[in-house]
From Swiss-Prot:
Pfam families, per the entry: GKRP-like_C (PF20741), GKRP_SIS_N (PF22645)
InterPro entries cross-referenced by the UniProt entry: Etherase_MurQ, Glucokinase_regulatory_CS, MURQ/GCKR, SIS_dom, SIS_dom_sf
Span of domain SIS: 58-221
Protein name per UniProt: N-acetylmuramic acid 6-phosphate etherase
Complex and partners: Homodimer.
Misc: A lyase-type mechanism (elimination/hydration) is suggested for the cleavage of the lactyl ether bond of MurNAc 6-phosphate, with the formation of an alpha,beta-unsaturated aldehyde intermediate with (E)-stereochemistry, followed by the syn addition of water to give product.
Gene Ontology BP annotations: amino sugar catabolic process; N-acetylmuramic acid catabolic process; peptidoglycan turnover
Gene transcribed to yield this protein: murQ
Organism of derivation: Clostridium beijerinckii (strain ATCC 51743 / NCIMB 8052) (Clostridium acetobutylicum)
Function (record text): Specifically catalyzes the cleavage of the D-lactyl ether substituent of MurNAc 6-phosphate, producing GlcNAc 6-phosphate and D-lactate.
Residue positions of the active site: E86, E117
Keywords: Carbohydrate metabolism, Lyase
EC number: 4.2.1.126
GO MF: carbohydrate derivative binding; carbon-oxygen lyase activity; ether hydrolase activity
Pathway field: Amino-sugar metabolism; N-acetylmuramate degradation
Length: 304
């Protein structure tokens, strides 16, 4: 790899708007930051066609038994771990389906692991441990777009035949060149020069929100805008589950509780039972036949 040259990276440029941020009032300081943050959504908007393409291709691969795996270092890696960790409780998927790998391992989530991001070989080792296949998708996260760990991971994933996607915040980056789909919201120089946990991190989080949410919608994990595969693992989520059943079916809380008790708090099954008027076993068979899509299962009944 060529010698590191940060001065040409947008993420490392000095922001002329914030040069005097250390001299202004606290209110003016946060106003400046807020104004800079407003630029993030606009940068992401320019990448929507690529994000949509990624969602469709990832969902297709998951239907074939694949997984979604994020790899990154530092803030980017942590964002991948964060997004992956939210999928099981929100959408009822296994912890294997969406995974986050951070350079340096789990310890690096809480404390920077010096030098880990500079090793392409480490990424290869980490992905080999996951036994990736051509049905998997590897999303490389690197605000700078030059992280060796991410480059190595994407290059190896491509050799295996997996779908490769990059999420960076600099145009025409080395990381992007290794990806089949390159998503690059260019948010401009950071409020604090080079601190990519700020706008760049926010942009990456927005992109990951779209990707994981879009994929889960494509997998039938959402009915209307309700998270129907929610795992009710605590009191708050139990009450949320009841509310979801009520909203989806129009029944009251008492009836929703009764339906959920019958299904061992399988929210989707409870909703489909109420809407289809089928018993538990019949409803489960019909849902399974339609790969868990409530709308498709209901349409099949209506067409008879």
């Amino acid at each position: 790899m060529e010698s590191l040259n940060l001065k040409n990276l947008t993420t490392e440029s000095r922001n002329e708007t914030t040069i005097n941020i250390d001299k202004v009032s606290t209110l003016e300081m946060v106003k400046i930051m807020n104004d800079e943050d407003k630029k993030v959504a606009n940068a992401v908007e320019k990448e929507l066609p690529k994000i949509a393409k990624a969602i469709d291709m990832i969902a297709e691969r998951i239907h074939r038994g694949g997984r979604l795996i994020y790899i990154g270092a530092g803030t980017s890696g942590r964002l991948g771990v964060l997004d992956a960790s939210e999928c099981p409780p929100t959408y009822g998927v296994s912890e294997e389906l969406v995974q986050g790998i951070i350079a340096g391992g789990k310890e690096a989530i809480f404390r920077a692991k010096e030098g880990a991001e500079d090793s392409e070989e480490l990424a290869v080792e980490d992905l080999k441990s996951k036994n990736i296949t051509e049905n998997d998708t590897i999303i490389g996260l690197a605000a700078s777009g030059r992280t060796p760990y991410v480059i190595g991971g994407l290059r190896y994933a491509d050799q295996i035949g997996a779908l490769t996607v990059s999420v960076t915040c600099n145009e025409n980056s080395d990381v992007a060149k290794e990806a089949y789909i390159s998503i690059a919201p260019v948010v401009g120089p950071e409020v604090v020069t080079g601190s990519t946990r700020l706008k760049s991190g926010t942009a990456q989080k927005l992109v990951l929100n779209m990707i994981s949410t879009g994929v889960m919608i494509k997998l039938g994990k959402v009915y209307g805008n309700l998270m129907v595969d929610l795992r009710a693992t605590n009191e708050k989520l139990i009450e949320r589950a009841k509310g979801i059943v009520c909203k989806a079916t129009g029944i009251n809380m008492e009836e929703a509780t009764e339906a959920l008790n019958k299904t061992d708090y399988d929210v989707k099954l409870a909703i489909f039972m109420m809407l289809s008027k089928l018993n538990k076993d019949e409803a489960r068979i019909k849902l399974d036949k339609n790969k868990g899509y409530i709308a498709k299962a209901l349409q099949e009944i209506d067409n008879k």
